[in-house]
Amino acid sequence: MKVGIIGAMEQEVTILKEAMTNCQTVNKAGCTFFSGQINDVDVVLLQSGIGKVAAAVGTTILLDEYQPDVVINTGSAGGFDSSLNLGDVVISTEVRHHDADVTAFGYEIGQMAGQPAAFKADEKLMDLAEKALEQMANTHAVRGLICTGDAFVCTAERQAFIRENFPSVIAVEMEASAIAQTCHQFNTPFVVVRAISDVADKESPMSFEEFLPLAAKSSSEMVFKMLELVK
């Protein structure tokens, strides 16, 4: 099996990249692809860049040229579930755009024209993530809806909009729905596994920039455990 792994920022992929053997690097269309092995599993690690367009471009190249069997989106996310704290893990059951609105044409809020309202994560990959979590002592995780938009959600107004329109949301970030939609169009199974870098409505002693390396470490550990179970 070949596993595609996608992170937006250098900080989100560095730990995984450093664990790769026989690593080959290709730069294309503003994206960086690292192909090799992690724990004897064939992987292609993509550093896509931030935001939905960058993620869609990178995922398209990944799926078309490298043809992984499955895709794991890793990195950081902002927590919306009240039980989440910094460093906790979120696992997607489904992914939606929170900044898409073509309701004037009869679509649901968050649904892009011609696309499903939600992109369902692969059941086997979700179960794999749960099994990986069992091997991570003292790591709290929540499984549910992750919402994506081309904005860092930091205002009370935007948080309220998301909560009102997507009441089951557990986390938000800036790439997953683009990755999910691209995987949907390529019929490639996906799951999103991210670590919480900040939490809505909770004061944190650490800023996003300060906590990002720790979130990257936590999400990378999840991916390592999943790759061990894939073999």
UniProtKB/Swiss-Prot annotation:
Catalyzes the irreversible cleavage of the glycosidic bond in both 5'-methylthioadenosine (MTA) and S-adenosylhomocysteine (SAH/AdoHcy) to adenine and the corresponding thioribose, 5'-methylthioribose and S-ribosylhomocysteine, respectively. Also cleaves 5'-deoxyadenosine, a toxic by-product of radical S-adenosylmethionine (SAM) enzymes, into 5-deoxyribose and adenine. GO terms for biological process: L-methionine salvage from methylthioadenosine; L-methionine salvage from S-adenosylmethionine; nucleoside catabolic process. Its EC number is 3.2.2.9. GO terms for cellular component: cytosol. Keywords: Amino-acid biosynthesis, Hydrolase, Methionine biosynthesis. Pathway: Amino-acid biosynthesis; L-methionine biosynthesis via salvage pathway; S-methyl-5-thio-alpha-D-ribose 1-phosphate from S-methyl-5'-thioadenosine (hydrolase route): step 1/2. It holds the Pfam family PNP_UDP_1. Gene3D superfamilies: Nucleoside phosphorylase domain (3.40.50.1580). It catalyses: S-adenosyl-L-homocysteine + H2O = S-(5-deoxy-D-ribos-5-yl)-L-homocysteine + adenine; S-methyl-5'-thioadenosine + H2O = 5-(methylsulfanyl)-D-ribose + adenine; 5'-deoxyadenosine + H2O = 5-deoxy-D-ribose + adenine. Belongs to the PNP/UDP phosphorylase family. MtnN subfamily. It comes from Vibrio parahaemolyticus serotype O3:K6 (strain RIMD 2210633). The active site is at 12 (proton acceptor), 198 (proton donor). GO terms for molecular function: adenosylhomocysteine nucleosidase activity; methylthioadenosine nucleosidase activity. Substrate binds at residues 78, 153, 174-175. CDD domains: MTAN (cd09008). This is 5'-methylthioadenosine/S-adenosylhomocysteine nucleosidase.
